[in-house]
């Protein structure tokens, strides 16, 4: 039987946002403390409503220790309100942690930042490489306000897909306010959102945990877009290690294919021990959920170690597959670049050929009319033809008659023509050498 709003008791309102209200509730059947978010779907089209319901159903399938658990959805058709029932995180969100550190002028410990990095990356890995073989889920709105902490300070990633659901031409989309500090360069350039866009947002979040401010700040969205496209930011405070700064810098690479994947982040030596501990704990949780007694786990550490190694092998296989896909993508890009280089070379050869033909025609015209070599340039350029005996026609006829009757000048013209032919041959050799060098340069690229 589907749940109803009457099955829950509202305790108090935690906060409000572009989506509506977030309230702390108690389930009447067992007293479990949860939260729900109210979404007013009254102004949505039927297609958007269907997408909203299917998206929430998909989110219910995400089950991971570092992902906020989605329990149920309740549709109140009378008030055109959708309630999304989720896990309650009593530790608040990372935005409040950053605000507290800013007010107290106190940086967060690197150990805490590394734990956040580890657990968030494991959460993203579950979304990008679904363990149950389901469709890839992209978060699309990873920021401190959407990352929560439980009572033991474990990280819980929440609010999946809600930004994408609401960012349509609906009343909710129009109520969006604020500056998108974590928006990736792909989004700024109106390109498709991908897994590496989540990695960019993760890098921005980790940067803000260290510096207590985003890597890119501005007073307007236009100015911010320019700074993000430029991709320049300060180093995190020097109290943090170079290794942490290096991995955050890699996450904030402008080229998405240069950013590390979730597998590459988890394999980083900086958090390798933390990753192993988290995976061991997750394995123990799965065992308890399957009804395995804790004593049998304690009595057979070899079995649990084998299971852990099996999981690690599966993860490495997935990482290898992802790397193969990236290599194929790079090969395709290289093929495109090679075609462009061949086109450029063909155009260059065509230009050289046309230039050579033009030059040959010029020399042939000079050879057929050797008297043009000794004429002033002003006379050659002027092609004035008037009817009757004008000054120009009289000058040209007198000069040509005097040159044709002079044998000594004719010999001189032949010598000059021979010298011009030699120069043409030398120029042709230089052009061939230049053509060879240009091909070598294009081959190096």
Curated annotation (Swiss-Prot):
What's its catalytic activity?
L-seryl-[protein] + ATP = O-phospho-L-seryl-[protein] + ADP + H(+); L-threonyl-[protein] + ATP = O-phospho-L-threonyl-[protein] + ADP + H(+)
- One Gene Ontology MF term: metal ion binding
Provide the tissue specificity: Isoform 1 and isoform 2 are expressed in peripheral blood T-cells and a wide variety of transformed cell types. Isoform 1 and isoform 4 are expressed in the testis. Up-regulated in various cancer cell lines, as well as primary breast tumors.
Q: Where is this region: Interaction with PCNT?
A: 264-445
Cofactor(s) needed, names only, are:
Mg(2+)
Q: What does this protein do?
A: Protein kinase which is involved in the control of centrosome separation and bipolar spindle formation in mitotic cells and chromatin condensation in meiotic cells. Regulates centrosome separation (essential for the formation of bipolar spindles and high-fidelity chromosome separation) by phosphorylating centrosomal proteins such as CROCC, CEP250 and NINL, resulting in their displacement from the centrosomes. Regulates kinetochore microtubule attachment stability in mitosis via phosphorylation of NDC80.
* Name by which UniProt lists this protein: Serine/threonine-protein kinase Nek2
Taxonomic classification: Eukaryota, Metazoa, Chordata, Craniata, Vertebrata
């Amino acid at each position: 039987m589907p749940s109803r709003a009457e099955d829950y008791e509202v305790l108090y309102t935690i906060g409000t946002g572009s989506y509506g209200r977030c309230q702390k509730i108690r389930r009447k059947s067992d007293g479990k403390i949860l939260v729900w978010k109210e979404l007013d779907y009254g102004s949505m089209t039927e297609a958007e409503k269907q997408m909203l319901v299917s998206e929430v159903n998909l989110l219910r399938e995400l089950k991971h220790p570092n992902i906020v658990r989605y329990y149920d959805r309740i549709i109140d058709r009378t008030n055109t309100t959708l309630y999304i029932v989720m896990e309650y995180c009593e530790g608040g969100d990372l935005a409040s942690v950053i605000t507290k550190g800013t007010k107290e002028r106190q940086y967060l410990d690197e150990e805490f930042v590394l734990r956040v990095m580890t657990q968030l990356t494991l959460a993203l890995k579950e979304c990008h490489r679904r363990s149950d073989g389901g469709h890839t889920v992209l978060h699309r709105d990873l920021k401190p306000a959407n990352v929560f902490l439980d009572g033991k300070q474990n990280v819980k990633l929440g609010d999946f897909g809600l930004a994408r659901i609401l960012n349509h031409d609906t009343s909710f989309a129009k109520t969006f306010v604020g500056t998108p500090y974590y928006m990736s360069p792909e989004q700024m350039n109106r390109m498709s959102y991908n897994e590496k866009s989540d990695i960019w947002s993760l890098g921005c979040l980790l940067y803000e945990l260290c510096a207590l401010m985003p890597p890119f700040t501005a007073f307007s969205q236009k100015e911010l877009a320019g700074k993000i496209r430029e991709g320049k930011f300060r180093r995190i405070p020097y109290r943090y290690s170079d290794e942490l700064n290096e991995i955050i810098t890699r996450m904030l690479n402008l080229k998405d294919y240069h950013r590390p994947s979730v597998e590459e982040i988890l394999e980083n030596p900086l958090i390798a021990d933390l990753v192993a501990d988290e995976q061991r704990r997750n394995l123990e949780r799965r065992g308890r959920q399957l009804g395995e007694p804790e004593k049998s786990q304690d009595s057979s550490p070899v079995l649990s170690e084998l299971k852990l190694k099996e999981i690690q092998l599966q993860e490495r296989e997935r990482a290898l597959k992802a790397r193969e896909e990236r290599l194929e993508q790079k090969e395709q890009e290289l093929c495109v670049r090679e075609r462009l280089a061949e086109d450029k070379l063909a155009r260059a050869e065509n230009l050289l050929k046309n230039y050579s033909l033009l030059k040959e025609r010029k020399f042939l015209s000079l050879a057929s009319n050797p008297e043009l070599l000794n004429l002033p340039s002003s006379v050659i350029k002027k092609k004035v033809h008037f009817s009757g005996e004008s000054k120009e026609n009289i000058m040209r006829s007198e000069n040509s008659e005097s040159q044709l009757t002079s044998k000594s000048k004719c010999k001189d013209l032949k010598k000059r023509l021979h010298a011009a032919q030699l120069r043409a041959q030398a120029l042709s050799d230089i052009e061939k050498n230049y053509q060879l060098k240009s091909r070598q340069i294009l081959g190096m690229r």
